[in-house]
Amino acid sequence: MRSFFAASLVLLISSAFMIAQESSKPSGEEGHLRALESAWNHAEQSKDAAALNQLLADSFVYVDYDGTLMNKKQFLASTINGEVQNEQINNEGMTVQVYGDAAVVNGAYRDKGLEKGKPFSRHGRFTDTWIFRNGTWQCVASQSTLIRQ
């Protein structure tokens, strides 16, 4: 009887260890959302309006680092209009939390380029809220905040 309990205890502990290892691995959705964040950076850098249009929901709301509030149409226009030429946009330290058909992505970013002909280099944090509907993930809200240098 004692050996049965010992074997059961070993099995229980090893099962708990395996479950803990599995939960620390990113899910398929987490990896997909990280890829979408990278695709967003690439689309913004290359001023790809079609790609951005697919990534952003029609109800998209953006709060820029300076407090500017934009809807999807305004965000696309500001990204495509040419005032900002992003040479580089990189995300760092992203965390992804999936809640069924919704997800929140937090992280830091670094971007540099030209704005109205003047060089800039920014480091900030962002929060993006994504929803899954009609078979695809789309961002419904994004907010960025500059990190003081």
Predicted regions and their residues:
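A beta-strand edge to alpha-helix "cap/lid" segment located at domain peripheries
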Residues: F4-F5, I19-Q149
